[in-house]
From Swiss-Prot:
Disulfide bonds: none annotated. The lineage of its organism: Bacteria, Pseudomonadati, Pseudomonadota, Alphaproteobacteria, Hyphomicrobiales. Substrate binds at residues 16, 38, 65-74, 119, 180, 189, 209-210. The active site is at K67 (proton donor). It holds the Pfam family OMPdecase. GO terms for biological process: 'de novo' pyrimidine nucleobase biosynthetic process; 'de novo' UMP biosynthetic process. Keywords: Decarboxylase, Lyase, Pyrimidine biosynthesis. Homodimer. The gene is pyrF. InterPro entries: Aldolase_TIM (IPR013785), OMPdecase (IPR014732), OMPdecase_AS (IPR018089), OMPdecase_bac (IPR047596), OMPdeCOase_dom (IPR001754), RibuloseP-bd_barrel (IPR011060). Its EC number is 4.1.1.23. This is Orotidine 5'-phosphate decarboxylase. Belongs to the OMP decarboxylase family. Type 1 subfamily. Pathway: Pyrimidine metabolism; UMP biosynthesis via de novo pathway; UMP from orotate: step 2/2. It is an enzyme of class 4 (lyase).
Length: 232
């Protein structure tokens, strides 16, 4: 399991907010309690990519959760553009052609993460989508493919971390959304753990959104999460 020099890097704050102004306010309130921020579709379509570039220039780390999946050339060029923004992580869907294209487009400093199965999915959802395998087996299969292709890490639920680690080895990254501090509501995530449980399960980075973005004191919540992971 790769170790970060700064324990704050283990926490990725999900900026699932409506606009850049709201994201700026939250980042300011969190201050030095967090160093790593995730930008997904909602904010990306509202000026979030320029904001990500600005965060990178200010020394923050950024995770562009764009889940790319298209023809190879489009993915490859899209990854190059993300790299030019100074992003640290970028997600693609874990389809072999997509992953190979992403690896071709990857620049220095950018790590590609493959999304195996959304953490909001359970076995019933996977079956409805037409997959014959249960979620755990599908995650393991895709993790093996990703490792063989040269992907840097895997996005998966904490419950699958052990199986994924066995497929990608000790140097691969495991990034887990659906993390909720003790007592927080699960929201739309179906497979969740606390930060401490996730760290004990071998997770490298945890993604936390609403428990921080909706908190009265987001800085304090971020500090508590980092401390919980440090003490594991």
């Amino acid at each position: 399991m790769p170790e970060s020099a700064d324990p704050r890097d283990r926490l990725i704050v999900a900026l699932d907010l409506p606009d850049v102004a709201a994201a700026e306010r939250l980042v300011a309130r969190i201050g030095d309690a967090a160093t790593f921020y995730k930008i997904g579709y909602r904010l990306a379509y509202a000026g979030g990519l320029d904001f990500a570039a600005r965060l990178a220039r200010e020394g923050k780390k950024t995770f562009l959760d764009l889940k790319l999946h298209d023809i190879g050339n489009t993915v490859e060029e899209g990854v190059r553009s993300a790299s030019a923004l100074g992003a640290t992580f970028l997600t693609v869907h874990a389809y072999p052609q997509t992953m190979r294209a992403a690896v071709r487009g990857r620049g220095p400093g950018l790590k590609i993460l493959a999304v195996t199965v959304l953490t909001s999915y359970d076995d019933a959802d996977a079956a409805e989508a037409g997959y014959a395998l249960p979620v755990a087996d599908l995650v393991a299969q895709r993790a093996s493919q990703a490792a063989a292709i040269g992907i840097d890490g895997i996005v998966c639920a904490a419950a699958e971390a052990g199986a994924v680690r066995g497929r990608i080895g000790p140097s691969g990254l495991i990034v887990t959304p659906g993390i909720r501090p003790a007592g927080a509501e699960a929201g739309d995530q179906k497979r969740v753990m606390t930060p401490g449980q996730a760290r004990a399960a071998g997770i490298d980075h945890v993604v936390v959104g609403r428990p921080i973005t909706g908190a009265g004191d987001p800085r304090a919540v971020a500090r508590t999460i980092v401390a919980e992971m440090e003490n594991v």
